[in-house]
Amino acid sequence: MGRKFFVGGNWKCNGTVEQVEAIVQTLNAGQIVSPDVVEVVVSPPYVFLPIVKAKLRPEIQVAAQNCWVKKGGAFTGEVSAEMLANLGVPWVILGHSERRSLLGESSEFVGEKVAYALAQGLKVIACVGETLEQREAGSTMEVVAEQTKAIAGKIKDWSNGVVAYEPVWAIGTGKVATPAQAQEVHANLRDWLKTNVSPEVAESTRIIYGGSVTGASCKELAAQADVDGFLVGGASLKPEFIDIINAAAVKSA
């Protein structure tokens, strides 16, 4: 069985109740390809998760944008994996570059978070990616492999994980890795999984692209053999997110 296309929408720290309800209405009214072809997840800020989950069409799932590395307790401001599971939130994004860079989350810490969230029954979108300086220094794969290794060393079951390659230099900048650049990193990352984890995990794990994906760029990116979907930022707040979801049809054409 092939890898089902996966499209995640990361709403980041955006929205009001009214804006979020408008986005949900747009998604509910949109014509999207069959759930047999694409798995869709949107990730609103924590405070809007119950609203979105209650009002969104059932075939679109929800994700949290982060969770704590262990069980809840005296960790002011944090949300535990157990809380998300209790709310019926199936997915969580971990290791996003904004958290790595702005909040100093290390690869080791992200690996611990991923392992803990999976152990609590959540599904995880684990993010990896290099900065512009690292790309220009020719160390893209070294960086991505190091970040992935920190996760791989802590988990055994990959069936509930998706890896999101997000070149940091292409996030929120309007710059997009060319389809060839994205395919190269995705293929190398799959090879790394094959060598360092197992051929089965490499073949079954979805590796999605996250770097200023738009309605204009999505189809050509989706056509790449090792691009199994997208983690979409700003465009997931706009009607063009429907077009990005429907790029999944490229895989089944």
Curated annotation (Swiss-Prot):
**What EC number(s) does the entry state?**
5.3.1.1
Q: Where does substrate bind?
A: 10, 12
InterPro entries linked: Aldolase_TIM, TIM_sf, TrioseP_Isoase_bac/euk, Triosephosphate_isomerase, Triosephosphate_isomerase_AS
**Is Membrane given among the entry's keywords?**
no
A cellular component annotation (GO) from this entry: cytosol
Q: What pathway is this protein a component of?
A: Carbohydrate biosynthesis; gluconeogenesis; Carbohydrate degradation; glycolysis; D-glyceraldehyde 3-phosphate from glycerone phosphate: step 1/1
Listed SUPFAM superfamilies: Triosephosphate isomerase (TIM)
- The enzyme's main class, written as a single word, is isomerase
Q: Which PROSITE patterns match?
A: TIM_1 (PS00171), TIM_2 (PS51440)
Q: Which residues form the active site?
A: 96, 166
Q: What is its main location?
A: cytoplasm
Q: Name one GO biological process term.
A: glycerol catabolic process
User: Per the similarity annotation, which family is this?
Assistant: Belongs to the triosephosphate isomerase family.
Entry protein name: Triosephosphate isomerase, cytosolic
Organism, scientific name: Hordeum vulgare
